[in-house]
A protein has these predicted regions:
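Alpha-helical recognition segments enriched in aromatics with Gly/Pro capping
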Residues: 1-106
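Feature 926 captures the class I aminoacyl-tRNA synthetase adenylation module centered on the KMSKS loop
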Residues: 1-2, 47-85, 104, 113-517
Length: 517
């Protein structure tokens, strides 16, 4: 059999055979359980009284999108060469890594391949393209700088901590043949890198000159891109090779010829900060809930809000509060132990669980629950995990699963809650907040017009506005802020030149134009 015959063992190459036996792993489809896995095991046990392999990866069969076995006669077979031509090898590989555990059947569907390609590969490529765009504008060469960890901003240190934790997780999962877990760790990191780090750091790349903070941002993102490319190289070999050739080989002739000749990244344990990662994860959860509360209140993110109250089991430092305020466009974030001033709770019994437990007492339990001080009852439930009632001298103990809990919001406030966090938005808007919302909308509309007019990222422009006294007044009052945001040298009112467009901004109609200088 192959492990023995390939080296003509036992007639020669005894030392070579012993170095390679047993194999670290063997991989075949499930239909080879008897024909291959068992045959090898039987022969090896007979000859050596030991298994010929240390690990087995059994691959499930590939089915069509409806879970049916592929068959030419049924017409549901997919030509692999057509699929490769349509989606690319990397996208198909990534689909198989993430769709299910290797030993389970895989339902192959083009739309699923495209979705995986968009969520991971597209996000990674867009982040890489962002870096390349601004690196070319600034003639940035990573070989001329070093990553000075002690000089980095908190966001930089957080990204590097996430990076090293990810590399560690990928290495551990691959070493233990947990392929989907390794792929999902990479996908989670790339999502954080693109949709949080880059989005929060854009203005650092836009800054003039090459100050230390801008260098730090470049070097942090460069390090993350190169490292994640190396970690993902075994899974998406072609895209990562492109990234490596442009980011590394093009500026360092001494680097290995290919990313596949590089060592797998080593983990920098001293960069890993679990507390920082936990705090940022808590922050992100608050931001997600804050956005949901805004949607419930039907208030766009460009409209500033006065205050958000947060009730949670943790506290965040002022640094993280500032990020929340900026991300949610909120003036103040207040952590509170009690939010009874803004919301109230009411309780009903969950018939499915309370009925079998207490039967005839069900109606009395329902009546007692309706008379409770909802906020005190919720506090008891959260602190002890149960709610105790006294009904006809009998102690009734209800768990959270026994209760239907309704949260009512006070007028002028909107809340979102999960098991550990509640956020409450004060939706009362002052005239000053409303005017600031107009400014945000104006900046957004001007940026849209820049793109539609085909202006380059760094082009200076002149902005025009007419036909609405309120909008014109706001643009005059906040001219410096607007000009700074849209790279404008001047705001002209009462006339228009260049690319012109009519807008309806918060029910105010205005004509605006942009002109390249």
């Amino acid at each position: 059999s192959m492990p023995f015959a390939q080296h003509h063992y036992p007639f020669e190459n005894k030392e070579t055979f012993e170095k390679q036996f047993p194999a670290q792993f063997i991989s075949e489809a499930v239909d080879q359980t008897r024909g291959w896995f068992y045959s090898l095991l039987a022969i090896s046990t007979l000859l050596f009284n030991k298994a010929p392999y240390e690990n087995v990866i059994v691959l499930g069969l590939v089915q069509d999108e409806n879970g049916q076995k592929m068959s030419k006669s049924k017409g549901n077979a997919v030509d692999p060469f057509d699929a490769l031509q349509t989606y690319g090898a990397d996208a198909i590989r990534w689909y198989f890594y993430t769709s299910s555990a290797p030993w389970l059947p895989s339902r192959f569907a083009g739309k699923t391949v495209v979705e995986g390609q968009r969520k991971f590969m597209g996000t990674l490529w867009n982040t890489y393209a962002f870096f390349v765009l601004y690196a070319n504008i600034d003639n940035f060469d990573a070989t001329k700088y070093s990553l000075e960890y002690d000089k980095l901003a908190v966001m930089d240190k957080w990204l590097l901590s996430r990076l090293e934790s990810t590399v560690k997780a990928v290495d551990d999962n691959l070493a233990n043949y947990r392929i989907p877990e390794a792929a999902k760790a990479l996908q989670s990191f790339v999502d954080d890198m693109s949709n949080w780090y880059v989005r929060r750091s854009r203005e650092r790349f836009w800054a003039k000159g090459m100050e230390q903070d801008k260098i730090n941002a470049y070097m942090t993102l460069y390090t993350a891109l190169v490292t994640v490319a190396k970690a993902a190289a075994p899974m998406i070999p072609f895209m990562t090779e492109d990234i490596y050739q442009n980011l590394v080989k093009s500026i360092d002739a001494s680097a290995p010829e290919s990313i596949h000749l590089c060592d797998f990244p080593e983990v920098h344990e001293n960069w890993i900060d679990p507390k920082m990662e936990e705090d940022m994860a808590d922050l992100l959860e608050i931001v997600v809930m804050g956005r949901a509360a805004r949607n419930t209140a039907n208030i766009k993110n460009r409209q500033p809000i006065g205050t958000m109250y947060v009730k949670s089991e943790f506290q965040l430092s002022e640094f993280y509060k500032e990020i929340i305020k900026d991300e949610l466009n909120i003036k103040e974030v207040v952590f509170k132990d009690d939010i009874a001033d803004f919301i109230s709770y009411s309780f009903k019994p969950q018939m499915r669980t309370v009925g079998p437990k207490y039967g005839k007492l069900l109606n009395k339990i329902k009546a007692t629950l309706s008379e409770l001080d909802g906020n005190k009852a919720m506090a008891e439930l959260k602190s002890t995990g149960e709610l105790k009632l006294d009904i006809d001298g009998q102690e009734i103990v209800l768990l959270e699963e026994d209760l239907l809990i309704d949260m009512a919001q006070m007028e002028g406030y909107v809340s979102e809650s999960d098991h550990t966090i509640t956020v409450v938005l004060d939706t009362n808007l002052t005239p000053e907040l409303i005017e600031e919302g107009f400014v945000r909308e104006l900046v957004s509309k001007i940026q849209t017009m820049r793109k539609e007019a085909g202006f380059e990222v760094m082009d200076k422009i002149r902005v025009y506005a007419k036909d609405n006294d309120k909008i014109v007044s706001i643009m005059k009052n906040h001219g410096d802020e607007i000009k700074s945001e849209v790279l404008a040298e001047e705001i002209v009112t009462g006339e228009t030149k260049g690319y012109e467009k009519e807008w309806n901004i918060n029910s105010e109609k205005v004509t605006m134009a942009v002109e390249r200088i």
